[in-house]
Structures are given as C-alpha cells and as structure tokens.
Amino acid sequence: MADLAAAHPGQVTLLGYNYLRSPAFQAARALVADRVIGQPLAFRGVYDEDYSADPTLPWSWRMTHQGGGLGALGDLGCHLVSVMVALMGPVAELTAMTQIAVPTRPSPEGPRAVENEDSALALIRFASGAQGSFATSRVARGRKCRLQWEIHGSNGTLVFDQENMNELWVHRGGDAGFTRHLTGPEQPDFAAFCPAPGHGFGFNEQKVVECRDLIRAIQGTAPCGPDFAAGLTIERIIHAMATSNGRPVTLEAAHEDA
C-alpha cells in the first residue's frame, strides 16, 4: 500500500489512528513542540484492555497468524506506537518480548491453539537519544481502554490516560505537583462540537475530526496524517517487537524483516 501510494503522489492516504485527534493529545504535542517541558528524555506508554482475559472466550480466526496477523500488538500496540512516534520522533532500536497467556481456546472441534500474542513489553531507544518503555495487553483484567502515557522532560512531565480523555496532567519544573488541564473550547476541535468547557469530547468525535481532516486533504486545503508511509513505519516497529524475542533490533533490521 505504501509503495502504491508512493507511485501515485497526488493521492491522499490516511490511516485510522484516531487517538491522535483528541484535543488533549493535540495540546500535549504543542507543549512538547514548544519545549514547555524541556527536552523529552523518556516515554512510558501502556495500552491495556481485557477483551480476551476470559479463558473460556471461544477461539477465532483473529487468534491465528494467517487470519489475524499480530495479536495485542496489532489491535492495541499500533495505536500506542502512533502516539509515541508522534510525540517522541523515530525509534532507533528496541528490545521486546511477547507472551501468549491463554495457549488454547475452546472451539466446536475442541481446544485450538492461540498463535498470536496476548501481551508484549518493549524497551526503546529513540533516534533523539531518549529512552522509552512500552507495554500492551488484551488480557489485563479490569482495563477497558487504558491508553496511558507520560513523557518525562528536562523541565517537566506530561501524563495522559484515554479512560479520562479530557484531562492532561502537566508538571513544570519548580511545581510542587501536577496541574490538571481540562480540555475545552480553547482547542479548536473541541469548540467545533461544544462552546462550553467541561462537557467532554468523546471517542466518536475523534473519528469525526479524522474524517474532516481527510476531506480537507482531498480538497487540498490542509495536509493530514498518518499516511500509508507513516503507517508502514508503525508496522515495522510492531513487527520488530513481535520478532525481537529479547534481542535488540534496529529499525533497519525491522525494515528488512517487514
């Protein structure tokens, strides 16, 4: 798909990494770009859900390499990577491990093997020299959409949790603690839905903003992303995590393996 898009440079492409459209994320990206928290030093990210935590959940094609591809990395981890790269820049190297927590699932023919990962952990070195940690799971009981991340900078810290998606927590050097920033109409994408603060911006609104950005890009009035090329970068990262087996992988090697 990325090669096809490159062969047709006039075509607009967009992938549905909609968490990049939340007002809190947009505010965080601006704070990072403006160096409000100084030089980013470290990223800590988690994306956990529990939709596969029940061991009696029936086997499905999504649990196979041929039909479903990757497991938690493909369902959840790619979204965390999209946020991570947008905030921290390119990944240079990573070391990861994966786990299949429930090796078999019931089916009408009897127990069938689960082939793709239920969870994954990774340590990351960014091209900037910053470091990161990454975790994702589809068997984390009690977690519904815990896309949680924080950035430690030389002069502050940002903290976000998708389960409280209208809040961004900010610490600046010298502060005694964190300040809660509640998203509101000062973010244009929020104001397009509601002129009053505190009323909340939801998951579906993120998708509407995403569609608007695609339409604007087709009209030629504004660029949008991530496009297919950026999506290929995300795929290379999660496939590097899937094949690392505890060994360091450079993104050049991940490119060759993809």
Question: Where are the predicted features?
Answer:
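C-terminal glycine/acidic-rich active-site capping loop/insertion
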Residues: 103, 107, 113, 121, ...
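C-terminal helix-rich "cap/oligomerization" subdomain common to oxidoreductases
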Residues: 2, 6-7, 12, 199, ...
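Glycine/proline-rich active-site loop of Rossmann-fold NAD(P)-dependent oxidoreductases
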Residues: 115-116, 130, 143-147
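Glycine-rich phosphate/pyrophosphate-binding beta-alpha loops
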Residues: 78, 135-143
